[in-house]
């Protein structure tokens, strides 16, 4: 990826994002510096993907509080916490959002005995660390993931977990980018990913621009391409992983996992350890975001169902751990039993 989808413009003190709702037809960058704009950008998926949401929240918290005229630390902390809590209401399922906000809060508390200006500088430092760590994380995930793949493989991915979802290679697409650099000549199949078409609009956009062999398929074609022997592995990202390995990801992931198991195809979940939530015992503890039903009935620029027809629009589903071959993180590859192997990542 040559486009960095989320970054900080230090000269202007603004969060800069590429508006992903306009891709692939228009590349428009937005410069944001107030809480309402940043909340809206996260909620409306102008910036999306678990790692990118965390980065946007961190930089957003910094630029939103930078303009504070608070005369003392107590007042500044009150303003900081108001913005933090507001951001936390934007997307309930992606744990990286809360992880980043907690990191920024922890850094604030570590510097609480300093001046307001010193605390602001510390918040800048922490947000830049989160950005830099994400870049290194994606490279490490790519390296570990590539160790499970062979040249010429057919790979299926869902939604978008590439450079547009992070500050680097991404997660699920990281091994594909790394393999491309090494001449692996993968054949990638991307689900269009209804209802918002992140696979069609975003994944094919970035892979095609990178010169990677990518073929777009409708979501309901996945079973056929598996049966035809075109798929050797399924690679997807994750928004939250429970302690037992149950994984929340874009709606449709669970169905792919069931199909992959039936056809004997490995199902790989790729994501940073920051997406692992050991406080969630199982997938039942993960709150699933419900989005506006208009996204379903107006999905192609015009209404596709009669007015008055109801639509159900959960943004994510949970894949049971029994369908997951391995979870690939920046710290390494973990397999069943996930309750033990995931816990070891944090020891």
From Swiss-Prot:
Organism: Petrotoga mobilis (strain DSM 10674 / SJ95)
UniProt-annotated site: Transition state stabilizer, residues: 159
Binding-site list for substrate: 48-50, 91, 198, 249-250
UniProt GO BP: L-methionine salvage from methylthioadenosine; pentose catabolic process
GO molecular function: S-methyl-5-thioribose-1-phosphate isomerase activity
Pfam families listed in its UniProt record: IF-2B
Keyword hit for Transferase: no
Reactions it catalyzes: 5-deoxy-alpha-D-ribose 1-phosphate = 5-deoxy-D-ribulose 1-phosphate
Function of the molecule: Catalyzes the isomerization of 5-deoxy-alpha-D-ribose 1-phosphate to 5-deoxy-D-ribulose 1-phosphate, as part of a 5-deoxyribose salvage pathway that recycles this toxic radical SAM enzyme by-product to mainstream metabolites.
Active-site residues (renumbered): 239
InterPro entries: Deoxyribose1P_isomerase_DrdI, IF-2B-related, IF-M1Pi, IF_2B-like_C, Initiation_fac_2B_a/b/d, M1Pi_N, NagB/RpiA_transferase-like
Protein name: 5-deoxyribose 1-phosphate isomerase
SUPFAM superfamilies cross-referenced by the UniProt entry: NagB/RpiA/CoA transferase-like
Family: Belongs to the EIF-2B alpha/beta/delta subunits family. DrdI subfamily.
Enzyme class: isomerase
Disulfide partners: none
EC number of this enzyme: 5.3.1.-
Keywords: Carbohydrate metabolism, Isomerase
Pathway listed: Carbohydrate degradation
